[in-house]
Every structure is written in structure tokens, then in C-alpha cells.
Amino acid sequence: MGWSTAWCSVLALWLLWCAVCSNAASGDGNAFPFDIEGSAVVGRQDPSETSDSGVTLGRLPPAAERCDAGFFRTLSGECAPCDCNGNSHECLDGSGFCLHCQRNTTGEHCEKCLDGYIGDSIRGTPRFCQPCPCPLPHLANFAESCYRKNGAVRCICKENYVGPNCERCAPGYYGNPLLIGSTCKKCDCSGNSDPNLIFEDCDEITGQCRNCLRNTTGFKCERCAPGYYGDARTAKNCAVCNCGGGPCDSVTGECLEEGFEVPTGCDKCVWDLTDDLRLAALSIEESKSGLLSVSSGAAAHRHVTDMNSTIHLLRTRLSERENQYTLRKIQINNSENTLRSLLPDVEGLHEKGSQASRKGMLVEKESMDTIDQATHLVEQAHNMRDKIQEINSKMLYYGENQELGPEEIAEKLVLAQKMLEEIRSRQPFLTHRELVDEEADEAQELLSQAENWQRLHNDTRSLFPVVLEQLDDYNAKLSDLQESINQALDHVRDAEDMNRAITFKQRDHEKQHERVKEQMEVVGASLSMSADSLTIPQLTLEELDEIIKNASGIYAEIDGAKNELQGKLSNLSNLSHDLVQEATDHAYNLQQEADELSRNLHSSDMNGLVQKALDASNVYENIANYVSEANETAELALNITDRIYDAVSGIDTQIIYHKDESDNLLNQARELQAKADSSNDEAVADTSRRVGGALWRKGALRDRLNDAVKQLQAAERGDAHQRLGQSKLFIEEANKTTAAVQQVTTPMANNLSNWSQNLQTFDSSAYNTAVDSARDAVRNLTEVVPQLLDQLRTVEQKRPASNISASIQRIRELIAQTRSVASKIQVSMMFDGQSAVEVHPKVSVDDLKAFTSISLYMKPPPKPAEPTGAWVADQFVLYLGSKNAKKEYMGLAIKNDNLVYVYNLGMKDVEILLDSKPVSSWPAYFSIVKIERVGKHGKVFLTVPSLSSTAEEKFIKKGEFAGDDSLLDLTPEDTVFYVGGVPANFKLPASLNLPSYSGCLELATLNNDVISLYNFKHIYNMDPSKSVPCARDKLAFTQSRAASYFFDGSSYAVVRDITRRGKFGQVTRFDIEIRTPADNGLVLLMVNGSMFFSLEMRNGYLHVFYDFGFSNGPVHLEDTLKKAQINDAKYHEISIIYHNDKKMILVVDRRHVKSTDNEKKKIPFTDIYIGGAPQEVLQSRTLRAHLPLDINFRGCMKGFQFQKKDFNLLEQTETLGVGYGCPEDSLISRRAYFNGQSFIASIQKISFFDGFEGGFNFRTLQPNGLLFYYTSGSDVFSISLDNGTVVMDVKGIKVMSTDKQYHDGLPHFVVTSISDTRYELVVDKSRLRGKNPTKGKAEQTQTTEKKFYFGGSPISPQYANFTGCISNAYFTRLDRDVEVEDFQRYSEKVHTSLYECPIESSPLFLLHKKGKNSSKPKTNKQGEKSKDAPSWDPIGLKFLEQKAPRDSHCHLSSSPRAIEHAYQYGGTANSRQEFEHEQGDFGEKSQFAIRLKTRSSHGMIFYVSDQEENDFMTLFLAHGRLVFMFNVGHKKLKIRSQEKYNDGLWHDVIFIREKSSGRLVIDGLRVLEERLPPSGAAWKIKGPIYLGGVAPGRAVKNVQITSVYSFSGCLGNLQLNGASITSASQTFSVTPCFEGPMETGTYFSTEGGYVVLDESFNIGLKFEIAFEVRPRSSSGTLVHGHSVNGEYLNVHMRNGQVIVKVNNGVRDFSTSVTPKQNLCDGRWHRITVIRDSNVVQLDVDSEVNHVVGPLNPKPVDHREPVFVGGVPESLLTPRLAPSKPFTGCIRHFVIDSRPVSFSKAALVSGAVSINSCPTA
């Protein structure tokens, strides 16, 4: 029975264990991570699982009773069927959980598929789970798991696989998963792939590596490439073979013979050799370290001997230098001899080439003669053939007409045959045939020889450039060698001078040594005599003795503290390392102070002994302070240790508590076990199960507690012991340092006693001298500091070439940024009824005059249930207005529990009471309050949100000022803005004189600008750091704040290391949503050195500028078709996609806008700026040279993503000034700027002639312009400016202002009102009225929608359009309240900016003199420079917007975008500008400044000289380096930069000549200076200043030939002695410095210019001219040729038509072609002109026309000069009307099938750019 009971218990426990394990397993299986068919899986719960655990289990039947297969025993004892969805026939008794699920299923009821399988085991077909088809179900399944979504299978691929069905290998792996048996393996490129990639790049199918780096090759980049040798796998040191281009061993580098193949099987030898070499290198390093460790010091007493040996050594080296100099001189002589021998060879080669050319011409002539003879022979043969044919025809004729007998015929035939044989045998024919064959052979031979000579001649000519280049390099090397020799001579002379100086110094030292001995004797006598003179310092010495005694006491206390610390060390468990380190630092400082004192004590300077005594006193005080600080630090460390010990004790207490609970559980389990002993078998089994569970839980709890204890001990006490040990070491070190200090300071008493004996006779005059010196220094500083401040201001106003001005500017920027950040702190302040805040208004008072709006969040304290004194019904909220508070103000208050808005415009208050929602009924969270004033109309808004929904309660109340005033007339110095209360010395007006506000308050906006309480001027009775603000709930009106960011035009965000969230791949994507009304702004920016990427908004359209190191320069991607204008105050989704490292795509609102291809380059950036960037980044040289825009973004952004990964911009550490949310008020366009050709229009329901009132601000410098216009039939209502007078015209009745100076650039406010009795016009505060002639007549009110205009009108010919700004417009409407117009909502906007109005100021003379009657905008606005002002731009080169009118027929602008005051040189050898100058410009000192940008290595930049070029000054490029040179008498001073500056970036260069010294300053950082001895000769300059090049034949005398040719690049901002040089007297092949992409072609600029071809081209009686053009204007001269007798040819365009005019000496005749396709469409078009005597044909693309002129009986074929692109007017005949020069590009110019090179033209005059043509 006992055995049976035991077995039953074991069986019950086993069943319980199985149930627990099954439950745990099923629980784990429930964590299925995928959403199937878009719905979440909800687990089912069996009722038995939720049964009470305390139910008695006596109903469970004995274990021997089993249910059938497919059934399980429930707790009630019944058999129930298993619910396993047909996937199992076994389930667990009690719970019904299924066991042994089949068909790849799992779960409590086999209702789910295993990972890697998919199907519907419950309802699906088939009814079992199949392997995931990723990509193949059974044979190739590479998915972790899969699921269905939207009817499709989604695979979760393994690590090495990608694709919707895992059908591809991931990047960095290769293989073909679709091929059965194939898997994805990792790429193996031996570590020689691109290190910038996160994986090795190989073919995704074969695994062959792409782009092997480090000079490697092979399938896996496993060996060095041909021509290299080394270890490609391990050492990765493949180096170039040194075999003269021949092959070498790929491992050792040994040179091999041609065709030699490296045998296989030598790998072991190579690796053995590599190991031996490595061991040899290690032994060499050991030997080297041993040699370096050998000491080479010398004794001090042998210093003189060593000096003599050094002199001897220097003399030896001097002789070596002389020998080297002699050797160099011999080498130079040899080089010169070699050069002399080389020059005859070159001349011989040239002579041989000439002889070959002459022989070729002779052979050609003889060949032509032979051909003529052969032609003559052929003609003779033809004549003979004709005669034979004639004879034959005659024979036939006579044979037919005469009947001959057979005998006669036979005779004749025999005779004919004889004649034929005789003819054949005649000698002349044979001789001529042989001669012809021989001459033909000789001609062929001569022709081949001529070809060979021609080939040799061409080869010889091809060698000329190489030889010349070698000669040039050799010449440069000789120059460098000469300079090196000169430098060596200088060094030799310097060494000789140093030797002499050393000798003299040695003698001086010996003499000084003797004098020192004598002075020492004198000093000894003085010391003995000064003992009696020191009575005054005696008191000081006694005080020092006292200090020493105190220090001794302090050290005793330190010893006591040390013992106390050592006693407490045993209780320490943790100690702060930082505090101990600080104590050690203090001890170290003590050591330093002691050392300093010791040095002072050992000094023998008698005149400083008193001061040293004072220093010693200060040192003692410092020692005492440091010791006390060390004690405090130690005490602090002890306190921290005690706190940590208490914390550990608390943890021990918790552990003991848990242990007691465990014991209680154990006792309960034992009691249960005791009770279970008396129960039956079922109870025993149940009890055993419960006891086992309790024991298991107890054991688990104990294990957890033990683990916790161990972790605590390991983490805390172990670390504490370790730190304690460290602390002991530190304290011991501190004690040792303190002991050392004591040892050092102990001799002080002895030294002081010595002082007392030696300083008795010291004179006290040293004190008086020191005091007088200090007084004089203070007085001097007092005088100098104001002067320094003045100089600081002066330096700040000058050109920022120094770091001081930049620092000042940076400080100001930081202050502005700080204020900007403070204005965006969206946190409330708690006001207690006594506090107040004065806020910076941030908005100009001019902007507040006509329109004022303030919004804020308020949370007043709740009203108590019972009246108390704490709650106040009347409270002051805010005040904005004048300081005198009598008029011109507005405010907000609470009166009688209601919100009250008060404003005053000069006479009386207007109070608007919002009584529909008492303040006491507001909820206990923030509500929005907004007060607004438009003119005389006021309004207060209240928005009360709801916590439970997005619904809001809105309340509004309106009011109106009854007087005539409409402006809030404030001045900046008289304006204050108080919130919550006012200071005690400020008196509020009576309507606002209430108790201060109690509660929380937060400012939101002021006139649409974000504002904050934390941007305060002063705070009163408040500490913001202690006053806890109220938390603002995220209610309905703030939901949008969390997802969007606001940029105010000065803020920006920076995301560092964007690759931490995503990687650059085949497709790189940036996404962002923006919302803005601005025209311009910087959206995204990435910079890395000279490479950059910029996404900008210009005039409302997107532009992308980027350069990833492209060889062709930056790429510009723009919305040329104007598909997406984004400055409409709506959100637009922008995507930048970079595909396959070579294609940039711009997508807006998921629509493709533009794309462009570029050179294949990866994105080289890791950081990105959003919405703007710091000024130091925007003003960098890279961005200044390429980016036209540096305006930060203003508006809202959200959803910034990189590779579809979101970034929270406010969490970035360097984000500056970015605010939460997107305030709607900040996106309203209340202002519009008109340029004289623009207007805006809208259609609304407004009655302008009946009960109308409207107003607006305007600001302009133009005296005339249409401000507002409306028409209804013949009735017109308009407001305009006429000669500075405001005129209102209503149905022909005009009301005019009395003042005529409203075009002064200041803001003015206009209010118009029309009633049935009068018309009224108010300008500022001047009121004018006129009678309504329709008084008493009933007029029907217009209720239909009508169009009205601001700024101009397309239907008003009477008025010119307005130039200036209009803002804050409002109307009285029929359908809504008075409010400010949002111009963004207007339906028609033509060339109008709705974002900013440029601040314009009138010139001084305009304030006293009337302007002209002109509607065009003035050109002398602020920001433009006068003619006399310097044109140097201190910030950088600006982009020049050309003022030339654009041709309406042309797609391209006539003036491409260029840099202001910068010009492009090059293309021809003598491209240049010439400037005239005065003689006084070049005196003893002359200074030039210039900016340059080039990629050329040679070229002339600047040159000026006299007529004979004896006196000269020049700046040029040589081998990429800048060289500044001028003459000093017969010598030349040359300054050459060490670095190269032909990097394509802008550089500032200043070169100065001052008598015989020169200075070269580059970029304000590098200063090079040289000097020559003055010559005394006069320095005179007479010729012009050459810039960019010189005239032919100039500068060759002084500059090497390669640098004489023209500079190729851009030069700008030339200044002479601080004055700008702008007007060139002559220009040759110089154009503005264009920015943007360029292509091959010759560009003729709008400034005019032409090209004169060389003499090898002429237009005579017969020719063909062909060329391609891309015009930028529809008219202009293309080609012109003329002769002295009046004949000419002229090809030009006129309004898109191509015309050819010809005069052949008889009369003019012409033809023309009007192409169907516009020539000015921005594309290339081909034009061909063909002349054959009097016939002229013109081809334009595929269209042809011709003309036949009169014949000239005596034609003369003249050689006429050919002009291209223009012609001087003096050469045009009266019959040929002058035509303007051609503007555009010309290329592929051909005359008679011979291409023309404009770079070799006879003359290039004017603004013509050779071989460089802008494309946009």
C-alpha cells in the first residue's frame, strides 16, 4: 500500500510538472511578433485556468482512470474532447492543453504555425502549415518567419538575405538564393575594398570583388596588381615595381625579363623570406634603441673647450660648404654646357625638319609634273583610239558601198593585218609605254618618300612642345638651384657672422667674469655695511616668525587630522575619487608654492629682498588656505562615505527582511505539509504538489536574494574596497607631499634670521620706488584704456582682416542668438501677486502703430468655495505702451471676474469687456487669450480647451474707438512692456491700476512673432529659478506643437553623425515637410571641406547646389519648369534622392520635379544643418564662392527623415533657437513688397461705395504709384501717390493730402471711409474730407464679389504701378468682421514678395528736393554703392544681378549670374585689362589688394613698368605659387609663397612695395616679407597697369615666358592704396566672372566685343562659312568682312531673323531666313553661308534660302579681315545700318572646311570669353 501511495504521488507530481512545462512553453509560443491580416491575435482562456487556486482537488479521479485518445479529464472528473484543430490527439488532463502538435504547428491548441512556416491551421486550406516561400517553400527557405498582410506573404529574412521573398543576398554577401543548393556567403576581398563602406563590395552573384584598392587585384583582391609587389592579404603593402616599366615578382619585387612567368609553388620561400626580414627589422630596432641610449653629455667646466671645438667644427663645415659650392658651380657649368650642346641639336632638328619640308614640297611638285605628263599621254592615247575608230568606221562604210571580190577582200585583209603588226611593232609606242611605267613607279616611290619625310616632320614637330617643356622645367630648376646657391652663400655668411659674434661674446664673457668677481667683492662689503640699516623691516620679520609658528601648529593639526582619517578608513566603503584627487591637487599646489619660495630665498638680488619677504608671507597664507581646503575636502569625502555606508546598511536591512519572509513561507509550507499528512491520497497528492511549488518558489526566491546579495557585494563593497585602497594611496601620497612641504619650509626660519642680520642697513627707498612705479603704471593704464576702446571701435568698423573684429562680431552674434533663444522659451511663470516682468517687445514700434496683436496662455488660480482674502476678483495682467501711461497704450486686466481689454489711441480709453465667460469659471488648466487692434477697431478672443476631446469653447468681443485717431503712436525709447505687475515707481492708468496678477502666465506671440517672458529686461520680486512654473497640458490647441518645429529666420538645427540612424546606400534619401510664406531660405546644408550640398528656396522655388568633389565643379539642380511653388504657407513634402551615387532627384509632394546626372561620387558628409547654419559656416570660403544664398529659413518644419529614420530636432545638442509647434499667426502674410511691375488681386464681397472703411500702411521712396484700385463699370475707387501726395479718387471726386513728402521711406498709415454724406481720407493723423455728390440718392449696396488690386493694376493705364511695401490692410466687409488681410490668400499674385519688405532709407537730398515723376524703382537704394565708395566687400564676393533688360523672345537671360566686381581672364595669350594711373600712385610706398580664383599653374596677374621695363612691379603665378617681384635698382626682389593657390577657391592677396622692402599677405594669415639694400635710384612708372595679362612683347624681359601669358581664372576687387580701380581703359577677352556650369564655346557678353581672325582666313569670291550659335538676344552681328574698295559681307540677326547682306562692287543684295524654331530657345542652331561669285546661299538648321546678285565684270579676290560677334561702327558703310553686338555663344566655326581656333585669333577685343561658355 505504501508503494502504491508513493507511486500515485510521484505520478501526480509528474503530471503537475508536465502541465507547468507545457504552460511555460505555450506562454513562450504566444509571443508571435507579426500581425496576421492586420489584426492582433487575442489568446483564449480556458475557464479552468481562471478557477480559484484555493479549490479543493478532491474531485480528481484516481490516476488509473484514463480518458480515451482525443479526450482529457477535466477538473470535474469528466472526459472532454481535445481542442487541437486536428493537429494532435493528445492533451493535458486538467487544462486541455495540446501535446505533440503535428504538421508544423504550435500553441496551446495547435492553432499557430512554427517560425518559418505559414498557413491557417484553423480555417485555412490546406489545413496544415507550409514552409515560408522565401523564395522557395521547401528547397530554399531563408526566412526567420513570415506572415500574411493585405493578401501577400511578407518574409522576415535571415541576416544574409534581403528582398520581399529573400531572393537576393544582402549587401556584402554573394550567391543566388533562387538556385537550389545555393546560399549567401560573405564577400571576401582580403580587406582591400573601400574602407568607407560598412561591408566589402563584391558581385552579388559570383562574389568577385569590385574596386580593389591599395594596388591589388584578383578575384578576392588577394594579390598585388601588375606593376606592384608586396603582401596584399596581411601586410597590405603593395608598392610600385622599380623596373623601369618592366614586370617584377609580385611578392619580392625582383625585376623579371619580358615574358617571364613567375613559377608556382614558391609561396613558402616568400613567407620564410618575409619572416626573416621581419626578424631583421626587429633586431635593427633593438640596435637602434641601444645606440640611442648611449649618453653623450659633457662636464660644465669644459664648456670653453667644447666651444672652441665647436668653432673648429664650424670652420670645417664651412670648408665643406665651400667645397659643396664649388661642386654645385661645376654642376651648373656642366648643365650650361649640356644646354649649349642641346640647343644646336634642337636647331639641327629644326633645320632637318625644314629640309624635309622643302624636299617634300619638291617631291610634290615633281609628282604633279609627272601626273601632268601622264595625263598628256592619256590624251594622246585617246586621240589615237579615236582615229582608229574613225578608220574602222570608214572601212565599214566603204565595205558596204563597194562590192569587192573575194580575192580583193583577202588581199585587203592581209594588208590590214600587216599594217596592224607594223603599228604594234613601232618603237615610239613601246618606248612611251616603258617611260610611262617607269615614271609611274618613280612617282609612287617619291610619294612614299614624301610621306615618310612628312611623318618624320610631324614627329619632329611633336617633339618641340616636349623639348620646350623640358627646357622650361630645366630653366625653372636652374632658377631654383641659383636661389639655393644664393641661400647657401647667405647661410655661409651668416655662419661667419655667427663665428665672429661667438668669438666676441667669448671675450665679453671673460671680461664679465672678471667684473663679476670684482662686484662680488663689492657686494660682500655692501652686505656687511647694510646690517645696521634695517630697523623698519623688523616688524615684518616678527610677523613672519608668528606666521611660521602658526604654520607649525597647522601642520600639527594636519597630523592629528591624518590620524583621525586613518582611524576612519576602516569604516569607509566608498570614497569619491574626484574629491581625493582635488586634495592631491591642493598638495601639489603647496609643493609648487614651496618651490617658488625656495627659489626666492636662494636669490642673491639685494634690491628685491623686501618684496621676496612679502611673497614669502603670501606663500605662507596660501599654504594655510590650501591646508584648510584639503581638510574640508577630506571631511566632505568622509561624509559621502558615511552616507554610502548608511545606504549599504539599508540594503542589508532589506535583505534581512526578505529572508524573514522566506522563513515565514517555509513555516507555512511545513504547516500545510503537517495538515496534509492526515488527508486521503488525493489530498496527499494535492498537498505534495502545492508543497513542491512552495519549495520551488522558496528556492527561487532564495536564489534571487543570494544573487542580489552577491551583486550588491560585488558591485558596491568590492568597488568600495578598491576605491578605499586607492583613497589610502592618495592620502598617503598627500601625507608624503605635506611632509615634503614641511621639509622645504623648515629652513625658512634660518633664512629669515639671516635676513634679519643682512638687512639691518637696507635703505627703504625700494618701497617708495615700487609705489611710485605702480602709481605711474595705474595712471598710464587709466589713460590708455579709453584709447584702446576707441581703437577697438575703429578696428571694428574697418575691413575685418584681424581676429579682433571677428571676435567682436562673434560676441554680438552670440548675444543676438541668446536673445533669440530666450524669446522662444515656451514656459510659463508663476506670479504671486507681488511680482512683475518687463519684457523686450522684440517688434519695432513702427510695426505696432497700425496693427497690434498679443496672444498668451493664462491659468488663474481657482476661486475657492468660500470667500477668502487669497482670491482677488480684480487683477492687472499686462501693459504695453508709453512710459507716462496717460495715452498711447493697451493692456489687459481682470475686473469683477471678467476679462477686460483696454486700449488708448491718444484721447480716451476703449474698454472691451468679455463677460460671457467669467474668469472663475475657467478650467484648472491653461486657456488662450488674444487681444488685437486694427486701426481703431479692437477685439479680444478667449479659447477654452477641453481635456476629454478636441472640442474648444471660443468667445469673442469687439469694440471701436470713437475718435479720429487710428494709430498707436509710440517711440522706442518711450515704450515699456510689463506683464503680471509693474515696478513700484511706475503708475498705471486708472483703467488698469489694479492689484498684480496671481497665477501662471505664458506669452505666445506679439504681432505674429514668437515672444517669451524669459526674454525680459527686468524682473521684480521674482526668482524664476525658484518659482516653479505650471505645466501646460497637451490640449487640443497644442497637439500640433509636438510634431512640428518653428524657425524664425535666425535659428537652425544640427544633426551630427546622421549615419548612426541610417547608412548611405545605393539609394540615399532625405525627407522633410516645410511650411512657409517666405521667398528665400536655406532648408538643408551639408559641408565637408570644399565639398557641400545645399537645398535652398529662392523666389518660392527649390534649388539644389552640390559638389562632392566633381572634376567639373558644382552641380545646380533647379525647378526650371516652375512645377512646385512652395511659399504658399501650406505644408509641402520635399524628398531629395541620390540614386546609385550619380543621379540627384528632387521630389515635391510625391511628384517628380527635376533630376540630373553627375559624376559618380559617394556622399561625403556625416553632419547636416537644417533651416540654416552658423555664420562661420555660411561665410566660409567654400560656400561664399558657390552658394548665392545665406538666409536662414523662416517657417515651420516637421518630419525630417534620413533613410526613412526620424530625428527629433529639439533633442540635438547644437540646435539653436528652434521652437515647438507651428504658430498660425507667424505664417500670415500681412505685408507685400512691389517692385514697380507687380500687383496682387482678390475677389471678395466688399461694398466700396456705401458705408465702407479701409486702411493700410505703405512705405516707399517713389513719388508716384498706384496703391489701391477698384472699378465697377465706369465707377473707379483708387488710392495713389502723385508727386509724393496721397490722392483718393472716388467716382471722379479727388481728395488729396496736404503734405507732399510721403515718399520718404518711412511707414505711413492711410484710412479711407465712404458714407452717404462724405468721403474721408486720413493719412497718419491728418484728416481730409470731401462731400459725396450722391448725397440723398439711394444707392443699391453691391453684394456680388468684385476684384480689387493692391500695388498696381493691369487695367489702369492712368497710374504707374507702385514700388514699395504695403502692410496691415483691412476692410469693413459684409460677410465677416474687420481683420488684417492675409495676402497669402489672394488669388492673383504677380511678381510680389509676401514675406519681407526691404528697409529703405531716403538719401539726404531727397528730404529737401522733390523727386522726378517716374514710376521706375530708384537705383540708389540702401545696399548699393556710390561711384566714389570703395567696391571692396568685406564679407565676400556678392552675386551680380545684371540690370540689362531681358529679351522677351529668348529663353536664357542676356546676363548669366556672375560675381560682382570680378572678371574672367584667359582663353587667349594676351587676355587683359589696362588701367590708367597717376604718377603719384607709385611713390615710395604702393599697396595693391586683389582677390583671385584659378586652377592654372602659370599666368600673369599684375604688371606695371616704365617704357624700357627697367623699373617694374609684378605679381604672377609660377607652378601654382604666387610670386611678387619688383626691382630695387639693378637687383630684383622676389617673394614666393610656399603653398600653391591654384585650388579653384577665392584668395585675398595684398602685395606692398615700400622703398626696398616688399611684403606679400595671403588670406590675411600668411605674411611673407623680404628686403634688399636701398639703391638710391629713382623708381618711376609710366606705362598702364596690366591686369590678368600683358600686351604682346611686354614683361618678357623680367618674367619667365610661361608666366608672361594671360592669367586663366577670375580676379576681382582691385585696390590701389585703398582706393578701388574699376574703369578699364581697354579690355581684351575679359568677361564677368560667371558662376555655374560651363561648356566649350566662345561667349560674347552684353558689354560688347568681337574677334578678328588671323590672316590665314579670308572671304573672297568663293567660300563657305559654317558655325553654331546659341543666342541670348534676338538681334546682333554674327560675321562681318569688308575690303578697302567698299565690298563687304555681313551676317546678322534681327528679331530672330538671320540676314546676309553682300556688296560685290556693283550693288547690295541680300537674303534672309526666318526659322520656324526660335533661334533664342536656349539650344544650339547651325548657320551656313555659301558664296559662289554672285550667288549667296543661307542655311539655318534645315531651312534654306538663296539670292543671285549682279555679276561683277572685273571681280577681285581680296583678302578681307573677318570680324566675328561684332564690328567697330567706324568700319560700317552708310548703307549698312549699325547693329548691336551679338550676345551668346558660338562654337564649331569653320571656313572652307578648315576649323577656326579663336584662341589663335589676331585680336580679341572687349568682353569675349574664349573656350568657355555659360550654360544657364
From Swiss-Prot:
Transmembrane segments: none annotated. Disulfide bonds join 82-91, 84-98, 101-110, 113-129, 132-146, 134-155, 157-166, 169-184, 187-202, 189-209, 212-221, 224-238, 1000-1030, 1196-1222, 1365-1397, 1610-1633, 1785-1813. One of its GO terms (biological process) is cell adhesion. Residues 1409-1433 are annotated as: Disordered. Binding to cells via a high affinity receptor, laminin is thought to mediate the attachment, migration and organization of cells into tissues during embryonic development by interacting with other extracellular matrix components. The alpha-helical domains I and II are thought to interact with other laminin chains to form a coiled coil structure. Domain G is globular. This is Laminin subunit alpha-4. The gene is Lama4.
